[in-house]
A protein has these predicted regions:
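Glycine-rich, flexible loop/turn motifs
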Residues: 2-4, 118, 153, 158-159, ...
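Iron-sulfur (Fe-S) cluster-binding modules
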Residues: 92, 166-170
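Local cysteine-cluster metal-coordination motifs and their immediate loop/turn environment
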Residues: 25, 101, 123-161
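Short acidic, glycine/serine/threonine-rich loops at helix termini
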Residues: 54, 131, 168
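FNR/FR-type flavoprotein reductase catalytic core
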Residues: 1-127
Length: 170
C-alpha cells in the first residue's frame, strides 16, 4: 500500500522468487499480469502448501514448489534459485523476489554476481508509514539516482518496499 511495487514488463520473461509468506505480494501481481504465460514462480517453503495462497497463483502461472522438510533441502533450493536466476539473467529477463531477509540476502548476492535485473521487496518495520520517523531506512549503493542520494539512506515506506537490487545494500 505504501511506496513502490514491482515492475511489470509483459514482454519480458519474468521469474518470481518467493520464500514462505513472500508469496503473498505475487497473488495480485500474477492476476494483473497481461501475459501470465511469460511468468514463472519458484516457491520455497517449510509449511505444507495448504498454508499458502498457491491456488490463486497456480491458476495463472507455472509454480515450482520446493518444500524444505530435511536440512539438505535448503541447499537444493539455493542451488535451484541460482540456476534459475542464471537462466533469466542470460536472457535479460526480470527477476522479482520477496521473502524473509536471509532469503533476500541470498537473492541479492546472486543478483550482483550475475549482474541480473532483480527487484526485491523488503520487509522492513514501518513505524509511521509516511516517512516522518526514519525507522525504516535502507542503505543505498552508488547506483541510487544521483539527484536523490539522501546520504546513503532511503525510507522503505516512501521509496520501497520494492527496490532494484543494484541500488541497495543488504
Amino acid at each position: 500500500p505504501l511506496g513502490n511495487g514491482f515492475a511489470m514488463e509483459p514482454d519480458t520473461p519474468t521469474l518470481l522468487l518467493a520464500g514462505g509468506m513472500g508469496i503473498v505480494p505475487f497473488v495480485g501481481y500474477v492476476s494483473e499480469h497481461p501475459k501470465p504465460w511469460n511468468v514463472t514462480m519458484l516457491f520455497g517453503h517449510r509449511e505444507p502448501l495448504s498454508c499458502y495462497p498457491v491456488d490463486s497463483i497456480n491458476e495463472h502461472v507455472p509454480l515450482d514448489s520446493l518444500r524444505e522438510t530435511v536440512p539438505g533441502d535448503l541447499d537444493n533450493f539455493i542451488f535451484t534459485i541460482q540456476e534459475r536466476m542464471r537462466e533469466y539473467a542470460e536472457q535479460k529477463g526480470l527477476i522479482l523476489a520477496c521473502g524473509p531477509l536471509p532469503f533476500l540476502k541470498t537473492v541479492h548476492g546472486f543478483a550482483r554476481e550475475l549482474n541480473a535485473r532483480v527487484q526485491l521487496s523488503l520487509e522492513n518495520r514501518m513505524a509511521c508509514g509516511v516517512g516522518a520517523c526514519l525507522g525504516c531506512v535502507t542503505r543505498t549503493t552508488g547506483e541510487w539516482p544521483v539527484a536523490d542520494k539522501r546520504h546513503g539512506l532511503v525510507q522503505t515506506c516512501n521509496h520501497g518496499p520494492v527496490f532494484w537490487a543494484n541500488q541497495i545494500e543488504l
